[in-house]
Amino acid sequence: MITSAAGIISLLDEEEPQLKEFALHKLNAVVNDFWAEISESVDKIEVLYEDEGFRSRQFAALVASKVFYHLGAFEESLNYALGAGDLFNVNDNSEYVETIIAKCIDHYTKQCVENAELPEGEKKPVDERLEGIVNKMFQRCLDDHKYKQAIGIALETRRLDIFEKTILESNDVPGMLAYSLKLCMSLMQNKQFRNKVLRVLVKIYMNLEKPDFINVCQCLIFLDDPQAVSDILEKLVKEDNLLMAYQICFDLYESASQQFLSSVIQNLRTVGTPIASVPGSTNTGTVPGSEKDSDAMEAEEKPGSTCVGKSAEINPEPKDQISKMIKILSGEMAIELHLQFLIRNNNTDLMILKNTKDAVRNSVCHTATVIANSFMHCGTTSDQFLRDNLEWLARATNWAKFTATASLGVIHKGHEKEALQLMATYLPKDTSPGSAYQEGGGLYALGLIHANHGGDIIDYLLNQLKNASNDIVRHGGSLGLGLAAMGTARQDVYDLLKTNLYQDDAVTGEAAGLALGLVMLGSKNAQAIEDMVGYAQETQHEKILRGLAVGIALVMYGRMEEADALIESLCRDKDPILRRSGMYTVAMAYCGSGNNKAIRRLLHVAVSDVNDDVRRAAVESLGFILFRTPEQCPSVVSLLSESYNPHVRYGAAMALGICCAGTGNKEAINLLEPMTNDPVNYVRQGALIASALIMIQQTEITCPKVSQFRQLYSKVINDKHDDVMAKFGAILAQGILDAGGHNVIISLQSRTGHTHMPSVVGVLVFTQFWFWFPLSHFLSLAFTPTCVIGLNKDLKMPKVQYKSNCKPSTFAYPPPLEVPKEKEKEKVSTAVLSITAKAKKKEKEKEKEKKEEEKMEVDETEKKDEKEKKKEPEPNFQLLDNPARVMPAQLKVLTMTESCRYQPFKPLSIGGIIILKDTSEDMEELVEPVAAHGPKIEEEEQEPEPPEPFEYIDD
């Protein structure tokens, strides 16, 4: 056994090259044991490597590399490993090889990324030896079938050639494509490179044996290429693949921005006419009934039309197909279907609201109850609670009246057809001036009903805002117009809002500043930024500054690194409100990206800024950046949640609520629990609201603490001595927890993984309730119905059942509160003598014995029945009728029933609106549409007027 390497090292001083070679071979064998000794003579080995004439110089490099590796000098070790050429065996599993390969990939990645950011002429050549090792590594991954690893390294090193090769060579191409698309959506920090990767994915998807158009369109949304999407839709119509086209249109509406959709619609309109010449689609017959009848939600549908015969089925004319596609893309169909779902499945527990109403004693809690009611009934069109409590509602005055009127917009969200008729009593009239607060609230409500789907209502709101003579009406009009024209970047709307901003009126300016951001959402419009930042630096009104702070951030929505210059200048501003705007801009520009640089900036500001509002905003903004990986958020904010500064603690609570919304994340709830007992009341408010955001639609099985928190909200509301701030939080939390009749969830991303723009905007503006209660209503933008809606070829809902393969109680609605039984007043007992009392007692006992004997037999049989009932096991599955309420976690266990005639066009596990292919020739049974609540009730009450003609007969 060798105890020293001195003898071998001495051979390196020999003249004979063969002896030196022999020494190197021996040293290579013992280097792991004697590296410390060899390191003293490593210079001799280096000299051998540098000697061009030495035959085994590569071997010298290998030994030197191993010595430096043991010394911890990884860079030198890597250099010599590269010098060793093929002697450095990438397939070896030793720790040395693994470490050097890791360093090699890091080094190569760094060089590639630096090169990618340089212009064409300035790119530095990458070391070929480095590339050689990386290529060997890729080959090793492919040989070992470690495709995900290869894709990861290929994306890290910007090697698109390898990326494409890996996907195509893998044994599961669709799986690898899905994995790559997910990486693209969630982890790619650089927009330019992401777009290149998406182009490669589009190419692969299109070249599949059966092109995957649904995923191609998802990529094209990211690439912001509406023309390519239009081409695909046109191609599908030509090929008579209509159902696929409809499915893509629904997916587009859910994931793409308004501008993107309007471009696709524009392209389809120009396409509309020439398609008629396509063979196979020139049939003269049309679908039974005109396009109007094909509206899935037409309330006037004739009772006889619930069965559609297959024989009547003839290809619809292309124009009709295009108009249907435009109707889907415009969002009209999805909004109507969701409205139907929410009305049909409304499961609100009015007892909760009644108890809260009876407990509140001041105007702040009154407003909170009105807001909570609108959340609970969001989109259900049910204003039952308000109708039952008109006298109580009338207590709202001034801005509370504004908020209460606007809450109708949340209740009737998506109820667009009758919106103007519905809100008529609250809207400005030419004849008599009404209450300004009511009219302003009415205009704001119209915006909430049409949020992100303005259409014709934009022009109505535009005119109302032009003619408004009062700052309160202008405030409501600006908010309504901003909501309806969200993301449209319409110049006429922008100019009018700018005019309102420049009037330097605090009330109007606050709403106009925010609305400017809503209209220019994500446009990165340089002129808009210049106008808004310029005015923010001039104005003396804090309210206007607050509105602009959020507005500026919205203009940079989703712009990632393109917003860095603006963020930099805002963060350096001496005005704390503009620094806060900088935090929101980071949140909006990098939302959902998980960008480390953005997180570092926010964390730095959260602990270093001198202003509490800025620090709070910085921590809140973390939630927006991390929402794709909610499990990371608790660890990031756990220390901040224990900060000495209550504003930072509040921010940490809200960040958890935003990031983990709807997930029921246990770690987040564990962090919030102690905060609900915080000594500072507004921290408790934040913790209560955040807990509801996280636990929305969770059941006791999916999230055991939900009932505990329900009791906590109730306790805080009913405690006469508790603080108003905490009560406000608890009331809002109740509303959020049961939102949309227990049928909606808050999610910042769409089902397909895109950042859901209205949700992000809604949650950001909702957080501003800290300054201005009426902005609470914006949360309704983030409510997404948890539904699966199947549609047939005519875009109607067929009667079909889905099978949920888990126990019904897992995702059941919470049980309603029991109505407390009224206690009977106890009568004062009259005095009874002891002798009579004893006699009565004996009599009673005798009667009791008789009765018991009679009852004995009956009781026993009854008890047996009860036991049998209790023992009856809960079934392991449940059948749900279309349209079905299906929770996100439940989607995994959802399937079509075995004997079902319909086949879904995309997996049910994605949820949402799914086109179903009918495999049967029989008649179809359709789901009858339900009528919306609201104005219909008033009409029915007014109907008895026409008996005037009968009066003449009486005469």
From Swiss-Prot:
Single annotated GO MF: enzyme regulator activity
Gene Ontology biological process: proteasome-mediated ubiquitin-dependent protein catabolic process; regulation of protein catabolic process
Chain segments carrying region Disordered: 279-313, 839-879, 932-955
Short name of one Pfam family: PC_rep
Gene3D superfamilies: Leucine-rich Repeat Variant
Taxonomy, superkingdom: Eukaryota
Start-end of each PC repeat: 403-436, 441-474, 476-510, 511-545, 547-580, 581-616, 617-649, 651-685, 686-726, 729-761
Comp. bias regions, Acidic residues: 938-955
Basic and acidic residues bias spans: 290-303, 842-854, 861-874
GO cellular-component term (any): proteasome storage granule
Coiled coil (UniProt feature): none
Keywords recorded for this protein, A-Z: Proteasome, Repeat
Function: Component of the 26S proteasome, a multiprotein complex involved in the ATP-dependent degradation of ubiquitinated proteins. This complex plays a key role in the maintenance of protein homeostasis by removing misfolded or damaged proteins, which could impair cellular functions, and by removing proteins whose functions are no longer required. Therefore, the proteasome participates in numerous cellular processes, including cell cycle progression, apoptosis, or DNA damage repair.
Family according to the record: Belongs to the proteasome subunit S1 family.
Assembly with partners or alone: Component of the 19S proteasome regulatory particle complex. The 26S proteasome consists of a 20S core particle (CP) and two 19S regulatory subunits (RP). The regulatory particle is made of a lid composed of 9 subunits, a base containing 6 ATPases and few additional components including PSMD1. Interacts with ADRM1.
Protein name in UniProt: 26S proteasome non-ATPase regulatory subunit 1
